[in-house]
Structure formats: C-alpha cells, structure tokens
Curated annotation (Swiss-Prot):
Gene this protein is translated from: mpaDE
Chain ranges on the Lumenal side, renumbered to this chain: 1-6
GO cellular component, one term: endoplasmic reticulum membrane
Name under which the protein is recorded: Cytochrome P450 monooxygenase mpaDE
Pathway(s) served: Secondary metabolite biosynthesis; terpenoid biosynthesis
Keywords: Endoplasmic reticulum, Heme, Iron, Membrane, Metal-binding, Monooxygenase, Oxidoreductase, Transmembrane, Transmembrane helix
The keyword Iron is annotated on this UniProt entry: yes
Molecular function in Gene Ontology: heme binding; iron ion binding; monooxygenase activity; oxidoreductase activity, acting on paired donors, with incorporation or reduction of molecular oxygen
Biological process annotations from GO: mycophenolic acid biosynthetic process; terpenoid biosynthetic process
UniProt organism field: Penicillium brevicompactum
Membrane topology: Single-pass membrane protein
Length: 853
C-alpha cells in the first residue's frame, strides 16, 4: 500500500512539474503571437519540418502574425533583417541553441563530436575557429586556385565526353554541379578528388549520407532532447547506424592515410587544407585538442560542398529560365574575354572577381535560395533583449530564417521573391552595404560561415567557364523542385548542352598584354655556356596523354629529345641524358609501356655524342662533373653507367626513396640498379634553409654553382622530383635559357597568355582566345596534377620575359631554327630566336585543321 502511494505521489509530482513548466513557458511569452499549438508544444515545429516545406509555413505565419512569431513554447522566430545585429552580434553572449547540438556526428566509441559550426560552447568555438580562420581568408583561398582549376578541367572534359554531341539528350545538370562542388572541396582539402566527376555518381554514398544526416537533424533539432535518447545513446546505436557515421568514416580514412604517409617520411605531403590542419595541431599540442583536425575536416566535407552546390543550382536554374539575364551575363563575360583576356578554359580569379553582373548574379542566388532555411537559433542572454518592440526574457530561443530575411520586401522590394540580379547594380555604397548586411545566407556576427570565400571562388570561376564554352538549355523546368530539410535542396535540373564555337578573332584590335610579375633573379656577373644536344632520338607521342583538348587531325606528334651541356669554365654538367641506346634493357614494365604507347627512333647514348664530337670544343664524357636528371623517366635518364664513377648524379626531391633500389632488386622499379651503382647520388632540397636556396619568379630555386650562373628550379608535378633549370648566358644585356624538362610537351600549353597575347599574324583565326593558351595540361600523366598546373603557370611568367628563352625537352619547332651542339646558344637574344620561334607551334594547329578538312 505504501509502495502504491509512493508511485501515485511520484506520478502526480511529475505531472505537476510538467504542467507548471508548460504554464510558466506559455506565460513568459504569452504576449508573442503565434499558432495556439505552437505555444504549447514543439510538435507543431516538427510537423512543419517533416513536410519539407517548413520555410513556406514560416513565411505564412509571419504574414499572418507579423515580424515576430512564437514557433514553440520557448522558441520565437523573427523575420526582420534589421535586427540581425541584435540577435547575431560580433561580441560573445548569444550562444547557439540546442538545435545545433543535434548536428554533432556521433560514434559509440568517441561520442558526439563538436565542430566549428555545431558547438554551443563559445570558448570551445573560439578554440576551434581561431587557429584555422586565416586559412579561409580570401588571400589564402586564392593560393589554392590551381586546385579549383584542376577540377574545372575535369568537369569540362566529362561534359564534352558524356553529354556534348548526344543529340540533345537531357541530363541532370544539378547533379554535375554538385559533383563539381564536392570534388573541388575534396581537392582543396585532400589534394584528391572524391571521384564524383570521373565516375558521374555519388562516391562512397557521401551525398546520400549527408542528406540523410540533415533530414534527421532537421526534425531532431525541433525536439533536441529526443536526439540524446534516440541518436546519441550508446545502447540504441547497437541496433541502428549512428548519425554522421558515413561521413566520419571518409574523414577518418583520409586522415589516417595522411598521418601514415607522414610517419613513413613520404615526401609527397601536399600543402592542402588537411596538411595545414595537421600542422596547426602539431605545432600547438597543448592548446589545440588532438581531435581538432578531425572536426575541421568533417566541417569541410559536410558543410563545405552541399551548400555551395545549392547556390550553383539556384544560379543556373534562374539563368536558364530567365534568358535575358543569361544573355546579360554572357555579354559581360565576352567583353572581359575580348578586352582583358579572360580565359575560357580556366577563368582566373583576377579576371572574374570584379565583374559587376557576375557579382550581382551570385549575390541574387545567395539571397533567393540560401542553403539553410530554418531559423539560426540563439539563446537570449541574461538581462533579456528587445526586438521588434517586444521583450524576450533570458533563456528564450530566438532565431531568424535566412529564407525570410533574404526575402524581406521592405528591404529588397515588392519583387523580393523574384530573380532580379539588377537589384544589386547602380547602388550607392551605403545602399549596397545595407542589402549585403540584410542577407543571412552565411550567418552573421561571430558565427559567420568560414567557407564563404571558397564558395565565392568556385562559383565565380565555374559560371564563366560554362557560359563561355557551352550553350545550355533547361528541359521541363516545371520538374525543378525544392525540399527543405535544414539543407534547402533542389531536384530535377534537367538540361541539354552543346559546345559553343570558338570566337572569331577581331584582327583589327591589338590585344593589350598584362605586365608579368617580376622574376627578381639575383644579380650576378657570372655566366655559363649552354648547348642544346639533339640526341637524335625521336618519340611518337599521343597528344591526349599530354594536353587537352584533342584536335581532330593531330593524332600523333613526333618529338625530339633534347638534353643540355652546361659549362662553367672547366666545370661541365649535363641536364638530362635522353633515351639510352639499349632501351630494350630497361625494366620489363618500362619496355612494355614503351612498346604500347610510343615508337623510339634512332636512340644514341649522350656519352657517345660527346666522345665522337670532332669540333674544337673537346668536352668528353670523362669531363662531366655531374649528370642532372630533370626527372627519372626513361626518355631523360639515359645510361649513366656509360660515364665514369666520378660523375655525380644529381636528382630532385624524393627521387632516391621513390626509385631505388632499382631493377632487378625491385621487380616493380622503373629504373635500374646500374644507374647509380658505384656513383654518388645527390638529392637537391629546395628548403629555405639550404645553402644557395633562393626564389626565381614563383619558383623555389637553388644556385647550383654558387655564383648566380645556373639555378635548379622546383618544377614539381609531372613526376616525383621533377626539376627545371635556368642558365644565365649573357650579362650585357642580361639573358637566360630556361630548360623545362617535361613540365609540358607542347608550347600551346604555355601560350598565349595574358602576359603574352598572340600577335595578329600568328596563325589560324579559329584559336580560342588571344590571351588563352591553346591547350591545357592533360591530367593523364602527372603524378601531382595540381602541382603540374602550378608549374605551368610559373613557366608562363618566365616565358613572358623577353630576357628568357624557354626550351622544352620535346619541342620539335626548334629543329632547324636554332643552333645545336656543338654550337652554344648564348647569343639567342642577338639572333632573335625567341621572336622567331615563339609562335611556330601554331603549325601543329594549322596542320590539324587542314588534316580535318
């Protein structure tokens, strides 16, 4: 009997507690209007979110009740963007509500993981955000632009191969925009794409995993207490998959691979965002938690891609539906191309950052369809606040939905629900700032989105590339739909795509060249003699392996193989050795590759070339102090064993560990043991602390002889340890010869550029642009495509300097046009070799076009 009485007393006490809690909650906000059910329970909010149309219900509630509406017993929604600074101040004191607690990914072993965007603890937020904030500044983000260029190149290639020329077969363009956004962020974060673009599908189920995660947290965020029971309970997760598990698995795999490569002292550690995350934590182990890199990386994967794809789809849909705005944007891009040399294939940030109509379209897309469309909830601090002439006591959860703020008619006009980019044009500075500050898309105050600059960079580079190269038409626009599950996702952006013809050049207009960056080569009175040795070996190259796009008719290029004799007084070195005469004795895997991909004609050992020279030069193989490999591929390494053991072998970073032991000790090796047997091998380091380290243009460099006459340059990307060389050949006037190795295999990859636009009489008028290189480096062969692209850009700066003669290892246009060994090339400038040979590569283009005819 006593037990029964105790049970009843307990039950009554619980009921009374709940009743007083509801009454107190109802009473403290009783003057704030809203639906009756919402004042009593959060189930009203749950139902709105479950429909996938919560933003529409929120809009209707505010239309009915005004700018401040009660959405729950302790939750108030505000729609007036003028109070954004009040609710989202720059000072601490307005922590995020429990809605964000539900967005912490959970695993049974490690529990719930806070991240920059989901933590409520303001001190922890500062600890997580402050160390990495500078990485997301536009200054740092722009340094990663080549990584975005890499992904743009892959996207263009996939569109061409899959959808162009398919008789207007529709495809889901929205999916491909998302693939681009994810692979861009993957490259920025890991130096590796996830593979969405190459495979044309959701890799590892990441997209579905993120959508499932957001769908769950959207509902749980309305009743966060239940999330602790259902999603973050170690017992229940024995029987169900934890939230965010799939994304965390991808993150953990990437991190473990990177940590493992570092522990093994592998040299190919990229300076991508993951490496920077790990470096930051390692340099501050006492102040930064060991799990911080995991949290930072999770944020990049989870929030850094889907939200950007959302804006891309919004902008693309509205441009395709409103063709007038599409024409206006394309006209601006064409003007930038014609006047400022904007590249079609890889529009640069400098070329697109300040285009007014492009900027207006991006802002309008951000305004009209923000990626997150539920209120950004904050907890009112002690003392309460007054918003919209209404007092909110401490502890009240208050928030503004970006969807409502961004469409406020008092701020943006009666057509706030319409796509109209022109609303952003011809504004005073004051009015422009007012509109920008009224957009809540990236948040406001202390918790603004870190990834904003990355998103803007990707979008402003993507759309010029698409609109200058393709004609895109929407198919069945009525099938375009949206769903709001915290993420505001779009579906059904079906389109057809056609390649636009290359623009006709206006030969009456001289293209104005931009001034290239200063090379800042250290002054010196020392020079070397440079002789180009044509080894006599010819290689048949497949163009698609080395550059894009393919040109019909240009199916094969027969290329020479050059190496260089560098003489500093009585000291002589060779830069590369071409192909060894007995190439059939190379490792079997290399021989098989050669037989399947190329044809070698008339190979000669460079030692024989030197020893059989009948000129008065008199430099023999025994006189060679060192052989310098630009890299370790078969067509550059020759046969070092034909030189005396006293000849040193000099190689780039990482070659020693990557290539030896050689064959046959290592049956998979691509080099032979005899290449280094009995010989000193010196590996060049470009670390700033090394003796002779310097900077040449954008290249890290080493002064080889120590007198400023000859530099080795870190020309990474094509292969491990790839290097170039720069020789000072005259001092009055000063001139240099740059030896590019295999940085690229066709001068059309280097030219034209904004620094070096093609002259009016340089070739066929169907070329893409006067200041846009004819070809882009193919991603097929480089071991590090991003670094390879960066190297090409660095060479373009050298190539634009009238004092530098750029020689590529396989440039057939030089044969018969310049002096070869045993003559030296030091007088190239006096003989105007640069001017005479710079545009000869256009002959390949003309032959290709003629062959197509």
């Amino acid at each position: 009997m006593k037990s029964l009485s105790l049970t009843w007393i307990t039950a009554v006490a619980v009921v009374l507690y709940l009743v007083q809690r509801y009454v107190r909650s109802y009473w403290r906000l009783k003057d704030i209007p809203g639906p009756v059910l919402a004042k009593l329970t959060d189930l009203q909010r749950v139902w709105w979110v479950k429909t996938g149309r919560a933003h529409e219900f929120h809009r209707d509630m505010h239309a009915m009740y005004g700018p401040i509406v009660r959405f729950g017993p302790n939750m108030v929604s505000v729609s007036d963007p003028r109070v954004i600074p009040t609710i989202y101040p720059s000072r601490p004191g307005f922590p995020k509500g429990d809605f964000y607690r539900t967005q912490k990914p959970y695993t049974r072993n490690k529990g719930a993981m806070p991240a920059v965007f989901n933590t409520q603890d303001e001190d922890l937020h500062k600890q997580l955000r402050s160390p990495i904030a500078s990485l997301y500044s536009m200054t740092n983000v722009v340094r990663l632009e080549p990584l975005v260029d890499e992904t743009l190149t892959v996207l263009s290639k996939q569109l061409d191969e899959r959808f162009v020329g398919t008789n207007d077969k529709p495809f889901d363009l929205g999916d491909w925009l998302q693939y681009f956004a994810f692979d861009s962020m993957g490259t920025l974060t890991f130096s590796r794409r996830y593979g969405f673009l190459e495979q044309g599908r959701d890799m590892h189920g990441i997209l579905q995993e993120i959508w499932n995660f957001m769908t769950r947290v959207a509902v749980m965020g309305q009743i966060p207490w239940f999330d602790e029971i259902w999603n973050k309970n170690s017992f229940i997760t024995l029987f169900k998959r934890p939230t965010g598990f799939g994304v965390l698995k991808v993150v953990d795999n990437f991190i473990s691979q990177r940590v493992s490569s570092r522990e093994n002292d592998e040299k190919a550690d990229e300076k991508d965002m993951l490496s920077q995350f790990l470096d930051i934590q390692a340099s501050n182990p006492h102040s930064i938690m060991p799990w911080a890199p995991r949290a930072w990386t999770f944020s990049n994967v989870m929030a850094g891609s889907d939200s950007t794809a959302n804006v891309m789809r919004t902008m693309m849909y509205n441009l395709l539906v409103d063709r007038d705005t599409l024409r206006s944007l394309r006209a601006e891009l064409l003007e930038a191309e014609n006047s400022n040399g904007l590249s079609r294939s890889l529009p640069s940030w400098d070329g697109v950052r300040s285009l007014p109509y492009l900027d207006a379209c991006v802002l309008e897309a951000l305004r009209l369809h923000p990626p997150f469309c539920l209120p950004f909830e904050r907890v009112v601090p002690e003392g309460g606040i007054t918003v919209c002439e209404t007092y909110l006591p401490a502890g009240t959860v208050v928030g503004i939905s970006p969807y409502l703020a961004n469409r406020d008619k008092q701020t943006f006009g009666d057509d706030a629900d319409k796509w109209r980019p022109s609303r952003w044009l011809d504004l005073s500075r004051e009015d422009r700032v007012k509109l920008e500050n009224s957009i809540l898309t990236f948040g406001a105050g202390r918790r603004t989105c870190l990834g904003k600059n990355i998103a803007i960079l990707e979008i402003k580079k993507l759309f010029p590339m698409l609109l200058l190269n393709y004609e895109i038409e929407i198919v069945n626009p009525e099938n375009y739909q949206t769903t709001n599950a915290w993420f505001f996702r779009q579906w059904g952006l079906q389109a057809v795509i056609r390649k636009l013809p290359a623009p006709e050049r206006d030969d009456t207009i001289e293209q104005k060249a931009s001034i290239p960056p200063a090379l800042n080569i250290p002054p010196s009175s020392s020079t070397v003699e440079v002789r180009i040795i044509d080894s006599g070996t010819l290689l048949d190259l497949r163009p698609d392996l080395f550059w894009t796009p393919d040109l019909p008719g240009l199916l094969k290029v027969t290329a020479p193989t050059y190496c260089f004799l560098i003489s500093n007084g009585t000291r002589h070195v060779l830069f590369d050795l071409a192909v060894r005469q007995d190439w059939e004795n190379l490792p079997p895997s290399i021989v098989a590759m050669i037989k399947s991909q190329t044809v070698i004609q008339e190979p000669r050992n460079i030692s024989d070339v030197l020893d059989s020279d009948e000129s008065s030069l008199g430099v023999r193989s025994k006189d060679i102090e060192a052989i310098i490999w630009s890299h370790a591929h078969f067509d550059h390494i020759g046969d070092p064993s034909t030189f005396p053991p006293s000849t040193e072998l000099v190689v780039g970073p990482g070659i020693r560990d990557t290539h030896w032991p050689g064959f046959p000790t290592n049956p998979d090796a691509i080099n032979l043991n005899t290449d280094i047997q009995g010989r000193n091998v010196r590996e060049i380091s470009f670390e700033k602390t090394q003796k002779g380290a310097t900077k040449i243009g954008s290249f890290d460099a080493v002064d080889y002889f120590g007198d400023g006459s000859f530099y080795l340059l870190d020309a990474a990307g094509h292969s491990v340890g790839h290097i170039g060389a720069l020789a000072r050949v005259t001092t009055s006037p000063v001139s240099f010869v740059f030896m590019g190795g295999d940085s690229c295999h066709h001068a059309g990859v280097l030219r034209p550029t904004k620094y070096l636009p093609c002259p009016l009489d340089s070739g066929d008028t169907s070329l893409p642009c006067k200041s846009d290189s004819v070809f882009t480096l193919s991603p097929a062969l480089p071991t590090d495509y991003t670094a390879a692209l960066r190297t090409v850009e660095n060479i373009k700066e050298l190539d634009a300097c009238e004092d530098v003669f750029v020689v590529l290892a396989h440039d057939a246009t030089l044969k018969g046009k310049v002096d070869f060994y045993p003559s030296k090339i030091n007088d190239w400038k006096a003989k105007e070799y640069g001017k005479k040979t710079k545009w000869l590569f256009y002959k390949d283009i003309e032959n290709s076009i003629e062959g197509q005819k």
